């Protein structure tokens, strides 16, 4: 009997150990499973899903956006849809404030009503409702997707539709509808963009054929010089009128009621533009030293200590957080390499100039004057390619910053198109000024409240009498006679 007891106890102990082992193993497996599938811990799945996002790489590919969806089938994307949509809705939804959640509900309601209006044939009302929905929830993929489809099929605005599909995919990479829509529109939009660039080249060549001694062209160049400074400082908040800006540049006299800084901003731009005309336009390569010298002149009268120097503190620009001061030297070296690389110089001049502008303002290397320096660099590159310096009207400031914001979010194309628009309007102005057209060409008719820089230019050009340029004024040099 005693022997039987002894042999029984080890068996019971073995059973107990096995039970404990399987219990612990099962508990651990359950914990790992929940950890991997919970919305708060999606690192392993999220890492792979991030590879499927649409990327814009500020440190490398400035023209192309990398669409990595192209290597995955729709079936594979659908396999991730349920998991990804749930994890995104859980994690993002939890971060919404009560007001934001209310806006999203209202936006979805407006979107559904817009779809009903469209079915009823009331497209005007549908368009207004879609705009309202987008204003309430500009980051909601469903709103972006449905509005894009409405624009594509009913408004025939395939470019804007493609932009919204791109945004929807950036927010929800597993959205197979947005993916399919973008596959349909991407090539068409690229073709339209390429045709636009061909048209710009044709207008540039037509302008280049006009002799530099043409009196009308010289008047247009002089007026554009004043306009360029007026609008560039105006974008940054300078309150000088065009007449006051002209007076400061021509007389060097102070304007009553205006701050010293506002005067100095205008004088700094004048110095920088003369430096471009006298030096940079003729150079084969633009170096980091050239950019620092350009900035030194921009801030030469406002803040000579910071002029031409990298910032030494962290700055914040709206929702954009530029690199820290410790990274600026390396990033600017990379920018210099990109600026002079064979790949960059093979781009169309308008694309190249717009991307250089964006890249520099994205790095934000200076404590002040980043926007003015970036626009001056952009125009330097355009002038080297035979284009006139582009005027970005200060009345379009909100659009300008909106497109920069979209570029920060991953889609550089709207900003490049905006610069192309400004380039075309500037070219049209010069061509109009040197032609025998009795009236304004249609695309130049703008009211001042809409940013009528070209209408203002036309008025001043028409009223100006031919006059010789002063030697060394910075207005008589440049490529193909551009200021």
Curated annotation (Swiss-Prot):
One record GO biological process: response to endoplasmic reticulum stress
Region span, Disordered: 464-483
Pfam family, one: Fic
TPR repeat segments: 107-140, 141-175
Swiss-Prot/TrEMBL keywords: ATP-binding, Hydrolase, Membrane, Nucleotide-binding, Nucleotidyltransferase, Repeat, TPR repeat, Transferase, Transmembrane, Transmembrane helix
Domain notes: The fido domain mediates the adenylyltransferase activity.
Protein name: Protein adenylyltransferase Fic
Source organism per UniProt: Drosophila grimshawi
